[in-house]
Amino acid sequence: DYGFKEEYTVLFEIYDQDPIEVNDKDGSWKKKEVEPFYRAATDKHGKFSEDGISIPADISEVWLSSDYLGTASPVKLTINADHRISFNQNDYVKSLLEKASTPISRGATANQHKYLDVWTLLPGMDWDDNGRPNNLSKEKNIPPADVLYNIKSIFDKAGGRNIHDNYPEFFNGDMISDIPITKDTEVSLVFVNSSAAWYNTVGYYTYPTSEIPTIENIKRILAFPNASPIYKTAGVGALVCGDEVKLKYWNEDTGKFEDKFPKGVTIGWYLQGMGFRSTPSNGDSQGDLVKGMGPRYSTTILNEPGKDGVQRQRTISLRDSKSNQIVAIGFEDNIDLDYCDAIFYVHIAEKDAIDEGVIPELPT
Protein backbone atom coordinates (compact mmCIF):
# COMPACT_ATOMS: atom_id res chain seq x y z
CA ASP A 1 0.00 0.00 0.00
CA TYR A 2 1.71 3.19 -1.21
CA GLY A 3 -0.91 5.28 0.56
CA PHE A 4 -1.82 7.77 -2.15
CA LYS A 5 -5.01 9.73 -1.50
CA GLU A 6 -5.54 10.64 -5.14
CA GLU A 7 -5.61 8.31 -8.14
CA TYR A 8 -2.05 7.20 -8.98
CA THR A 9 -1.17 3.81 -10.47
CA VAL A 10 2.37 2.61 -9.77
CA LEU A 11 4.45 -0.02 -11.54
CA PHE A 12 6.72 -1.94 -9.16
CA GLU A 13 9.22 -4.79 -9.17
CA ILE A 14 10.36 -7.32 -6.55
CA TYR A 15 13.94 -8.59 -6.42
CA ASP A 16 15.71 -11.33 -4.48
CA GLN A 17 18.68 -8.97 -3.93
CA ASP A 18 19.27 -5.25 -3.55
CA PRO A 19 18.97 -3.92 -7.13
CA ILE A 20 21.09 -0.86 -6.30
CA GLU A 21 24.89 -0.80 -6.20
CA VAL A 22 26.41 2.01 -4.12
CA ASN A 23 29.90 3.44 -4.61
CA ASP A 24 31.30 3.64 -1.06
CA LYS A 25 33.79 6.35 -2.03
CA ASP A 26 31.42 9.05 -3.28
CA GLY A 27 27.95 7.75 -2.40
CA SER A 28 26.86 7.54 -6.05
CA TRP A 29 24.71 4.62 -7.12
CA LYS A 30 23.54 2.72 -10.15
CA LYS A 31 21.03 -0.01 -10.83
CA LYS A 32 22.47 -3.50 -11.17
CA GLU A 33 21.84 -5.54 -14.29
CA VAL A 34 19.60 -8.00 -12.49
CA GLU A 35 16.08 -9.09 -13.29
CA PRO A 36 13.19 -8.97 -10.79
CA PHE A 37 11.32 -12.19 -10.13
CA TYR A 38 8.01 -10.31 -10.12
CA ARG A 39 6.54 -7.23 -11.83
CA ALA A 40 3.08 -5.75 -11.41
CA ALA A 41 1.01 -2.58 -11.18
CA THR A 42 -1.03 -1.30 -8.26
CA ASP A 43 -4.64 -0.25 -8.55
CA LYS A 44 -5.44 3.41 -9.16
CA HIS A 45 -4.94 4.20 -5.46
CA GLY A 46 -1.45 2.71 -5.21
CA LYS A 47 -2.59 -0.55 -3.59
CA PHE A 48 -1.87 -4.15 -4.55
CA SER A 49 -2.98 -7.46 -3.08
CA GLU A 50 -2.66 -10.82 -4.76
CA ASP A 51 -2.17 -14.44 -3.78
CA GLY A 52 -0.10 -16.92 -5.70
CA ILE A 53 3.07 -14.90 -6.22
CA SER A 54 5.91 -17.38 -6.62
CA ILE A 55 8.67 -16.57 -4.12
CA PRO A 56 11.74 -18.84 -4.15
CA ALA A 57 11.67 -21.03 -1.03
CA ASP A 58 15.31 -20.39 -0.15
CA ILE A 59 15.05 -16.60 0.36
CA SER A 60 13.94 -14.81 3.53
CA GLU A 61 13.92 -11.20 2.31
CA VAL A 62 13.13 -9.30 -0.87
CA TRP A 63 13.56 -5.76 -2.22
CA LEU A 64 10.57 -3.73 -3.41
CA SER A 65 11.55 -1.26 -6.13
CA SER A 66 9.81 1.40 -8.22
CA ASP A 67 11.04 4.43 -10.13
CA TYR A 68 7.66 6.17 -9.85
CA LEU A 69 7.80 9.53 -8.11
CA GLY A 70 6.48 9.47 -4.57
CA THR A 71 7.48 5.86 -3.89
CA ALA A 72 10.11 4.75 -1.39
CA SER A 73 12.65 2.60 -3.23
CA PRO A 74 14.31 0.22 -2.84
CA VAL A 75 12.81 -1.14 0.39
CA LYS A 76 14.03 -4.37 1.99
CA LEU A 77 11.12 -6.52 3.19
CA THR A 78 11.14 -9.65 5.31
CA ILE A 79 9.08 -12.61 4.17
CA ASN A 80 6.54 -13.50 6.85
CA ALA A 81 6.11 -16.93 8.41
CA ASP A 82 3.12 -17.54 6.13
CA HIS A 83 5.41 -16.81 3.16
CA ARG A 84 3.78 -13.45 2.42
CA ILE A 85 5.19 -9.95 2.19
CA SER A 86 3.49 -6.69 3.13
CA PHE A 87 4.36 -3.01 2.87
CA ASN A 88 2.65 0.18 3.99
CA GLN A 89 4.52 3.26 2.81
CA ASN A 90 2.98 5.65 5.36
CA ASP A 91 4.08 3.39 8.24
CA TYR A 92 7.51 2.94 6.66
CA VAL A 93 8.09 6.69 6.30
CA LYS A 94 6.81 7.29 9.83
CA SER A 95 9.33 4.79 11.22
CA LEU A 96 12.17 6.50 9.33
CA LEU A 97 11.14 9.91 10.64
CA GLU A 98 11.05 8.59 14.21
CA LYS A 99 14.58 7.21 13.85
CA ALA A 100 15.81 10.57 12.54
CA SER A 101 14.32 12.74 15.28
CA THR A 102 17.03 12.41 17.96
CA PRO A 103 18.74 15.82 18.44
CA ILE A 104 22.46 16.41 19.02
CA SER A 105 23.64 19.43 21.02
CA ARG A 106 25.57 22.11 19.09
CA GLY A 107 25.43 25.90 18.61
CA ALA A 108 23.71 28.41 16.22
CA THR A 109 19.98 27.90 15.57
CA ALA A 110 17.61 26.76 18.31
CA ASN A 111 18.65 23.23 17.38
CA GLN A 112 22.23 24.57 17.37
CA HIS A 113 23.00 24.15 13.67
CA LYS A 114 25.55 26.43 12.07
CA TYR A 115 24.88 27.94 8.66
CA LEU A 116 26.63 30.25 6.19
CA ASP A 117 26.21 34.00 6.54
CA VAL A 118 24.82 34.15 2.99
CA TRP A 119 21.69 32.26 4.06
CA THR A 120 18.66 34.08 5.46
CA LEU A 121 16.24 31.88 7.42
CA LEU A 122 12.47 32.08 7.19
CA PRO A 123 10.86 33.20 10.49
CA GLY A 124 11.18 30.48 13.16
CA MET A 125 12.86 28.04 10.79
CA ASP A 126 15.04 25.23 12.13
CA TRP A 127 15.79 21.63 11.19
CA ASP A 128 16.81 18.33 12.72
CA ASP A 129 20.16 16.59 12.30
CA ASN A 130 19.05 14.97 9.05
CA GLY A 131 17.98 18.31 7.59
CA ARG A 132 14.21 17.96 7.89
CA PRO A 133 12.84 21.49 8.43
CA ASN A 134 10.32 22.34 11.15
CA ASN A 135 8.18 24.59 8.94
CA LEU A 136 6.76 21.99 6.55
CA SER A 137 3.04 22.20 5.81
CA LYS A 138 0.98 19.75 7.86
CA GLU A 139 -0.48 18.06 4.79
CA LYS A 140 1.51 16.67 1.89
CA ASN A 141 1.03 18.62 -1.35
CA ILE A 142 0.95 15.90 -4.00
CA PRO A 143 0.19 17.10 -7.55
CA PRO A 144 -2.31 15.29 -9.80
CA ALA A 145 -1.17 11.93 -11.14
CA ASP A 146 -0.79 13.21 -14.71
CA VAL A 147 1.64 15.89 -13.51
CA LEU A 148 3.71 13.29 -11.62
CA TYR A 149 3.75 11.03 -14.69
CA ASN A 150 4.88 13.95 -16.87
CA ILE A 151 7.62 14.97 -14.43
CA LYS A 152 8.82 11.35 -14.25
CA SER A 153 8.87 11.11 -18.03
CA ILE A 154 10.78 14.34 -18.64
CA PHE A 155 13.50 13.52 -16.10
CA ASP A 156 13.72 9.81 -16.94
CA LYS A 157 17.21 8.52 -17.77
CA ALA A 158 16.09 5.39 -19.64
CA GLY A 159 18.42 4.03 -22.28
CA GLY A 160 21.35 6.09 -21.07
CA ARG A 161 19.73 9.32 -22.28
CA ASN A 162 18.65 12.23 -20.10
CA ILE A 163 16.67 15.44 -20.46
CA HIS A 164 19.69 17.20 -21.96
CA ASP A 165 19.81 14.58 -24.73
CA ASN A 166 16.06 14.29 -25.28
CA TYR A 167 15.14 17.98 -25.23
CA PRO A 168 18.08 19.99 -26.61
CA GLU A 169 15.73 22.92 -27.25
CA PHE A 170 15.66 23.56 -23.50
CA PHE A 171 19.42 24.11 -23.49
CA ASN A 172 19.96 26.42 -26.46
CA GLY A 173 20.88 29.40 -24.30
CA ASP A 174 17.40 30.95 -24.35
CA MET A 175 15.92 28.95 -21.46
CA ILE A 176 14.74 31.04 -18.49
CA SER A 177 14.34 29.08 -15.27
CA ASP A 178 13.42 32.01 -13.01
CA ILE A 179 9.70 32.61 -12.48
CA PRO A 180 8.27 36.11 -13.16
CA ILE A 181 5.25 36.93 -10.95
CA THR A 182 2.46 38.85 -12.72
CA LYS A 183 -0.12 38.95 -9.90
CA ASP A 184 0.25 39.08 -6.11
CA THR A 185 0.28 35.47 -4.92
CA GLU A 186 1.44 33.03 -2.30
CA VAL A 187 4.08 30.56 -3.47
CA SER A 188 5.15 27.15 -2.13
CA LEU A 189 8.10 24.92 -2.96
CA VAL A 190 7.35 21.19 -2.87
CA PHE A 191 9.91 18.36 -2.83
CA VAL A 192 9.45 15.64 -5.45
CA ASN A 193 12.65 13.58 -5.60
CA SER A 194 16.44 13.54 -5.82
CA SER A 195 18.83 11.06 -7.39
CA ALA A 196 21.94 12.92 -6.24
CA ALA A 197 24.78 11.39 -4.26
CA TRP A 198 25.50 14.85 -2.84
CA TYR A 199 23.68 16.41 0.11
CA ASN A 200 22.45 19.63 -1.46
CA THR A 201 20.84 22.67 0.14
CA VAL A 202 18.11 24.53 -1.77
CA GLY A 203 16.75 28.04 -1.44
CA TYR A 204 15.49 31.01 -3.44
CA TYR A 205 15.91 34.73 -4.05
CA THR A 206 13.92 37.50 -5.73
CA TYR A 207 14.68 40.53 -7.86
CA PRO A 208 12.65 43.12 -9.80
CA THR A 209 11.60 41.57 -13.12
CA SER A 210 12.80 44.64 -15.00
CA GLU A 211 16.33 44.42 -13.56
CA ILE A 212 19.29 42.07 -14.00
CA PRO A 213 20.24 40.42 -10.68
CA THR A 214 23.79 40.38 -9.33
CA ILE A 215 25.40 38.31 -6.60
CA GLU A 216 25.63 41.45 -4.48
CA ASN A 217 21.96 42.45 -4.64
CA ILE A 218 20.16 39.15 -4.01
CA LYS A 219 19.17 37.76 -0.61
CA ARG A 220 19.47 33.97 -0.49
CA ILE A 221 16.64 32.52 1.60
CA LEU A 222 16.81 28.93 2.84
CA ALA A 223 13.99 26.54 1.92
CA PHE A 224 15.34 22.97 2.32
CA PRO A 225 18.58 22.31 4.28
CA ASN A 226 18.98 18.78 2.88
CA ALA A 227 17.22 18.14 -0.43
CA SER A 228 17.48 14.34 -0.10
CA PRO A 229 14.71 11.75 0.23
CA ILE A 230 14.44 10.11 3.64
CA TYR A 231 14.93 6.75 1.94
CA LYS A 232 18.17 7.96 0.28
CA THR A 233 20.03 4.93 -1.07
CA ALA A 234 23.18 5.70 0.90
CA GLY A 235 23.39 8.10 3.82
CA VAL A 236 21.17 10.69 5.44
CA GLY A 237 17.83 11.75 3.96
CA ALA A 238 15.13 14.11 5.19
CA LEU A 239 12.17 14.46 2.82
CA VAL A 240 9.29 12.62 1.17
CA CYS A 241 7.45 13.55 -2.00
CA GLY A 242 4.89 16.24 -1.19
CA ASP A 243 6.82 17.92 1.63
CA GLU A 244 6.01 21.61 1.20
CA VAL A 245 7.52 24.85 2.47
CA LYS A 246 5.47 28.02 2.04
CA LEU A 247 7.89 30.63 0.78
CA LYS A 248 7.82 34.25 1.88
CA TYR A 249 8.78 37.45 0.07
CA TRP A 250 11.49 39.59 1.64
CA ASN A 251 10.51 43.26 1.39
CA GLU A 252 13.74 45.26 1.34
CA ASP A 253 11.92 48.53 2.03
CA THR A 254 10.27 47.35 5.26
CA GLY A 255 12.90 44.79 6.22
CA LYS A 256 10.16 42.20 6.80
CA PHE A 257 8.88 38.96 5.29
CA GLU A 258 5.48 38.99 3.56
CA ASP A 259 3.22 36.04 2.75
CA LYS A 260 2.59 37.10 -0.86
CA PHE A 261 5.05 37.73 -3.66
CA PRO A 262 4.07 40.98 -5.40
CA LYS A 263 3.50 41.53 -9.08
CA GLY A 264 6.67 42.63 -10.80
CA VAL A 265 9.20 40.43 -8.99
CA THR A 266 10.93 37.33 -10.30
CA ILE A 267 11.83 34.30 -8.19
CA GLY A 268 15.19 32.65 -8.73
CA TRP A 269 16.47 29.36 -7.32
CA TYR A 270 19.69 28.50 -5.55
CA LEU A 271 21.40 25.19 -4.82
CA GLN A 272 24.48 24.87 -2.60
CA GLY A 273 26.29 21.74 -3.82
CA MET A 274 27.10 19.48 -0.86
CA GLY A 275 25.84 22.28 1.36
CA PHE A 276 24.50 19.97 4.08
CA ARG A 277 26.88 18.22 6.46
CA SER A 278 25.63 14.63 6.71
CA THR A 279 28.35 13.52 9.13
CA PRO A 280 30.68 15.39 11.52
CA SER A 281 33.76 16.61 9.64
CA ASN A 282 36.41 19.35 9.80
CA GLY A 283 34.92 20.92 12.91
CA ASP A 284 31.39 20.87 11.51
CA SER A 285 28.62 18.82 13.09
CA GLN A 286 25.92 16.79 11.42
CA GLY A 287 23.17 19.16 10.34
CA ASP A 288 25.41 22.18 9.73
CA LEU A 289 25.18 24.08 6.43
CA VAL A 290 28.56 24.55 4.79
CA LYS A 291 30.18 25.92 1.63
CA GLY A 292 30.56 22.46 0.13
CA MET A 293 31.03 22.56 -3.63
CA GLY A 294 29.68 26.08 -3.97
CA PRO A 295 26.51 27.71 -5.32
CA ARG A 296 24.47 27.00 -8.46
CA TYR A 297 21.91 29.59 -9.57
CA SER A 298 18.87 29.37 -11.83
CA THR A 299 19.92 32.77 -13.22
CA THR A 300 22.67 31.51 -15.51
CA ILE A 301 24.67 34.75 -15.57
CA LEU A 302 25.25 34.38 -11.80
CA ASN A 303 27.02 31.02 -12.18
CA GLU A 304 30.80 30.87 -12.12
CA PRO A 305 32.28 29.91 -15.51
CA GLY A 306 33.65 26.40 -15.86
CA LYS A 307 37.18 25.59 -16.99
CA ASP A 308 35.99 26.21 -20.55
CA GLY A 309 34.78 29.69 -19.62
CA VAL A 310 31.10 28.78 -20.03
CA GLN A 311 28.47 29.82 -17.46
CA ARG A 312 26.29 26.72 -17.37
CA GLN A 313 22.53 26.43 -17.05
CA ARG A 314 21.94 24.78 -13.67
CA THR A 315 18.16 24.48 -13.57
CA ILE A 316 15.22 23.84 -15.84
CA SER A 317 11.68 25.08 -15.15
CA LEU A 318 8.65 23.64 -16.97
CA ARG A 319 5.06 24.82 -16.57
CA ASP A 320 2.02 22.56 -16.28
CA SER A 321 -0.16 24.13 -18.97
CA LYS A 322 -3.38 22.58 -17.64
CA SER A 323 -3.30 24.39 -14.29
CA ASN A 324 -0.73 27.15 -14.94
CA GLN A 325 -0.17 26.94 -11.18
CA ILE A 326 2.51 24.24 -11.12
CA VAL A 327 6.09 24.62 -12.35
CA ALA A 328 8.43 21.62 -12.21
CA ILE A 329 12.05 22.53 -11.44
CA GLY A 330 15.06 20.26 -11.93
CA PHE A 331 18.52 21.13 -10.56
CA GLU A 332 21.90 20.03 -11.90
CA ASP A 333 24.52 19.97 -9.14
CA ASN A 334 27.59 18.82 -11.06
CA ILE A 335 28.46 17.62 -14.57
CA ASP A 336 26.23 14.74 -15.72
CA LEU A 337 23.51 17.16 -16.96
CA ASP A 338 20.51 15.03 -15.98
CA TYR A 339 18.91 17.88 -13.99
CA CYS A 340 17.36 15.49 -11.47
CA ASP A 341 19.80 16.03 -8.60
CA ALA A 342 16.94 17.85 -6.89
CA ILE A 343 13.44 17.89 -8.35
CA PHE A 344 10.80 20.21 -6.91
CA TYR A 345 7.65 21.82 -8.09
CA VAL A 346 6.50 25.34 -7.39
CA HIS A 347 2.85 25.75 -6.46
CA ILE A 348 1.39 29.15 -7.34
CA ALA A 349 -1.71 29.91 -5.24
CA GLU A 350 -3.35 32.34 -7.70
CA LYS A 351 -4.32 31.49 -11.26
CA ASP A 352 -2.63 33.44 -14.06
CA ALA A 353 0.02 34.76 -11.66
CA ILE A 354 3.10 33.70 -13.66
CA ASP A 355 4.33 34.81 -17.06
CA GLU A 356 3.32 31.95 -19.36
CA GLY A 357 5.31 33.38 -22.23
CA VAL A 358 8.59 32.96 -20.36
CA ILE A 359 8.32 29.46 -18.87
CA PRO A 360 8.02 26.62 -21.42
CA GLU A 361 5.37 23.95 -21.05
CA LEU A 362 6.00 20.63 -19.32
CA PRO A 363 5.90 18.05 -22.14
CA THR A 364 3.06 15.54 -21.89
Please give the residue ranges for each predicted region.
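Extracellular distal adhesion/interaction modules in secreted or cell-surface proteins
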Residues: 1-340, 349-364
